[in-house]
Amino acid sequence: MIRSQSYCFLGITITIYFFFCLLPLPNTFASPPTQSLCRHDQRDALLELQKEFPIPSVILQNPWNKGIDCCSWGGVTCDAILGEVISLKLYFLSTASTSLKSSSALFKLQHLTHLDLSNCNLQGEIPSSIENLSHLTHLDLSTNHLVGEVPASIGNLNQLEYIDLRGNHLRGNIPTSFANLTKLSLLDLHENNFTGGDIVLSNLTSLAILDLSSNHFKSFFSADLSGLHNLEQIFGNENSFVGLFPASLLKISSLDKIQLSQNQFEGPIDFGNTSSSSRLTMLDISHNNFIGRVPSSLSKLVNLELLDLSHNNFRGLSPRSISKLVNLTSLDISYNKLEGQVPYFIWKPSNLQSVDLSHNSFFDLGKSVEVVNGAKLVGLNLGSNSLQGPIPQWICNFRFVFFLDLSDNRFTGSIPQCLKNSTDFNTLNLRNNSLSGFLPELCMDSTMLRSLDVSYNNFVGKLPKSLMNCQDMEFLNVRGNKIKDTFPFWLGSRKSLMVLVLRSNAFYGPVYNSTTYLGFPRLSIIDISNNDFVGSLPQDYFANWTEMATVWDINRLNYARNTSSRTIQYGGLQTIQRSNYVGDNFNMHADSMDLAYKGVDTDFNRIFRGFKVIDFSGNRFSGHIPRSIGLLSELLHLNLSGNAFTGNIPPSLANITNLETLDLSRNNLSGEIPRSLGNLSFLSNINFSHNHLQGFVPRSTQFGTQNCSSFVGNPGLYGLDEICRESHHVPVPTSQQHDGSSSELEEPVLNWIAAAIAFGPGVFCGFVIGHIFTSYKHLWFIAR
């Protein structure tokens, strides 16, 4: 009995075991299918799509091959049970331009829930037949070349949770049908040409992230937004929004980030409607037209970590309400009309790491304070105010200051010696003050200093050789002081140095030493003009300046233009992702300089790393211009004017194909202007005046558009008719020149004399040729 029961139990156990073995495995146990999972209609639709949407097999990890289960193809995901294609991710995979047509095979994949065609070189309009993909929850068509209006049919895809259309050329209004997308949690329309329709978004109660930035919106949500109770981040920067600040945003307790910079909002601002449970950590309303005082109600935003009120018209004393924002790590109220004393709370222990108060009218740093060790300040910008008196010693008590900008103020006295003991300095900008004395021996105990700008002061003495220890030095500007020293050959070994400006000091002596390696392998900009440098330069002088022959891999830019940058946030600090510019530490700073560029004094607020400049003007250099200058193929600006260079203009200059400015004026150059310079297509400013040049001026568009003054002082030049709009003849020696009336009388006489001289030989040659012809005429006929 017991045995039979045991057999019965064993039989049941085996039956249950085989039953579970026959069940399909869940998708969690992802192993390659032993048989084809993909449905034939789905496979055929994908193969048809491949014909209209070029996808090179070489860039697919798993190529689309008819003999392979389509569910294992690259970018394709299928339902594990039904074999329907539910996800298609082909981002970055199309190498040729294509457009989505209404009849596209894509719309046969009607079970798709995820569609990602970002960065696929798509062109044309979004077809209305996209509504066939009724199961879509995620749609990403970002970073393409799509045009036209967004089809209203997208509003029928009521399962959508995610729409990303950024980085296209879409225009018009947001379709009213978007009000049906009640499950939508992310909508990204960044960088298009939308102009309106944002009012419909007030119905999207599931929205968590909304990005309308970089469009042409004008009216901002006339409807109440407080119903968007799930909204966490809103980006509306770089539009044309007008009117008052949308106070209804402050009622949304879930909101974490508000970015409304670079619009045309105006009027006073009030934060009185702020929710008591506000989670707001970032508020950026910079670059608008807000007026009045910074409101005291700002203190209600107790969780703020980043506050940017810069580039507005706020006025009055510094706002004390900010001192109550105990979580604040980054504060920017630059470019306003604030005045009085610098707010005291920035000197006290807090979480503040970066503070930018520049371009205001602060005139008092406050009484001497003892900065306690709890202060975490890393970046401080007080530039372009009216601060005066000596730089206080206690500024050195900030143990971790990484960046300090006191430029464009009225500071006097010497640089505090304690600064040389600061071990964490990366950037020190004291430009345009009335500081005097000697430069301190910086980089004695630290090698972190990357940028030093002490231009436009009254410093004397020599350039401190301790700067040789600054291993990371990229930028050094001592322009407009009274420094008397020889050329700093010892800086040539700094492999990081990109910008060296010694202009308008009292530097003297040669800039070449046969026993010293010149170095400067990464130098992009050197301006040593208006000093007392002398001597000749060897022909291989520029051979080691390899950076000026290196192509910077970016499209040509307008270097003086201050273009926008993408910001990345680390904690409370914002760093700028702008490696294309010299000085990329904080968004409050980029290295800047002024330069005589294209004949005009130009301020460069940011310095593009591909900007290559040599300015040796206003010295006493002699000898020939080195041929090796032609090796610097990426040089944009060359100024050797106001020296004593002799010899010919080196033809190798024609190898500098990107050259935009060439100034060789006020030298002793001779010979002809190389015709090959006329082939420099970017050359827009030329000055060869006041030399001893002769011969024809090259005929080209670049030379033909120059001012006549670019060639004056060269009596041997001719061919300037088109440039100077007047007749230029081959010059006659002074002793043979006469006044105009005498020349007119002599001209007919000279013409008759010339005719008589030519008549005699002409008659003689005629007789000789005639005799030969008549003597040998019969032989010619025989030969024929």
UniProtKB/Swiss-Prot annotation:
What species is this protein from?
Answer: Arabidopsis thaliana
Which positions does UniProt annotate with glycan attachment?
132, 180, 193, 203, 273, 327, 421, 432, 513, 544, 562, 639, 655, 668, 679, 687, 707
Instruction: Show the stretches that span the lipid bilayer.
Output: 753-773
Query: Which protein are we looking at?
Result: Receptor-like protein 38
Its keywords, alphabetically, are: Cell membrane, Glycoprotein, Leucine-rich repeat, Membrane, Receptor, Repeat, Signal, Transmembrane, Transmembrane helix
Sorted alphabetically, which Gene3D superfamilies does this protein's record hold? Answer: Ribonuclease Inhibitor
A Pfam family (short name) is: LRRNT_2
Name the domain of life: Eukaryota
Give the record's family classification: Belongs to the RLP family.
- Residues on the membrane's Cytoplasmic side span 774-784
What span is annotated as the signal peptide, if there is one? 1-30
What gene name is given for the protein in this entry? RLP38
Task: Tell me the compartments it is located in.
Answer: Cell membrane
Report each LRR repeat as a residue range.
Answer: 109-133, 134-157, 158-180, 182-204, 205-227, 228-251, 252-276, 278-301, 302-324, 326-349, 351-373, 374-400, 402-422, 423-446, 447-470, 472-496, 497-518, 520-544, 608-632, 633-656, 657-680, 682-705
InterPro entries linked: Leu-rich_rpt (IPR001611), Leu-rich_rpt_typical-subtyp (IPR003591), LRR_dom_sf (IPR032675), LRR_N_plant-typ (IPR013210), LRR_R13L4/SHOC2-like (IPR055414)
Membrane topology, as annotated, equals: Single-pass type I membrane protein
**Extracellular side stretches:** 31-752
This entry carries the following GO cellular component terms, namely: plasma membrane
